[in-house]
C-alpha cells in the first residue's frame, strides 16, 4: 500500500488561514507541557504533569545523546507512553528528522530492520521487551545506530553481550526513569561495561540537570554500598499528579539538597545503592508494585478491585 498526501488541498487550506501568529501566551519552563497517565491498568490512573523544562533537559545537553540536525530518529512508541517524548522532541527540538514507523512494520522484524536501514535511522529507543525479542533479528541495523537506548524493565545481560559481540551501536545505553521524572533520569553506557561475569545492569548515572539521592528512612544520604530509597530531583521532576493533591504531597516532597527554594524531589519507591565507581545499582521495590511487560502494576489496587466483587471475602 502507498500512503499519499494531497499537497494541493493542504496548501489551499493553509492559504485560507491568517498569516499572523496566533495570540497564544508564551509557555514558561515551569508550566506543564503535557499530562501522561501511569499505573492505570488497575485502579485509578495518575495523571503526571510533566514540565516544559523536563522535556528540554531530556533532549538538550543531556549528557547521554548528542542529537544533531543530521540525525534521524525512529518513532514507534505509543503517544501514551513516555518513551514517545524522547522520540518526538528529540527530533523536533534539535532539527532532526523523525521517521514514523507503522505498527504493522514494528511487528515484522524483517520489514522493521529494512526500514531502519533504508531511512538511515541513527537514534532509537526500544522498550526492554521489544529489545529482548528483536536483538538478534535486528543485529545488522542496530549495529549501525549512533544511539540505541533501551529501558522500562530489567535488562538481560546475555542479550546485551550478543549485541556487543555482533557489533554494537556507537552509543548503546540502558535508560531508567519513572514517568514522574520526565522519561529518563539516569543512563548507563553499555559498550564497555559488560563482561562475562556481569549478572546485573546498573541504572547508571544521572543525566543532565538531574540529581539522584539515595536516602535512608530519616531522609539522610546513605554511604556507598548501602541500600536506600532512590529520590530524583532536578528539572525533570513533574509538577505532581493532576487533581490528586494528597498523593502529590506524598510522592513529591521538598528537596533539602537543592539551592532552589521551592525545589522538590520525587520518591520513586525504588531501592538501590551507589557503587564505588559512581554508578547506581538497582535492588528492588519498597512496596508491592511490579512491572509486567514494562507496565507498572499496583498489586494493592488489584486486591482492592477483587474485594469489590460479590462473593469475594478477601483478596
Region spans (language model):
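Conserved pre-ATP/AMP-binding loop-to-beta segment of ANL
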Residues: 20-37, 44, 67-73, 79, ...
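Conserved AMP-binding
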Residues: 32, 77-84, 104, 179, ...
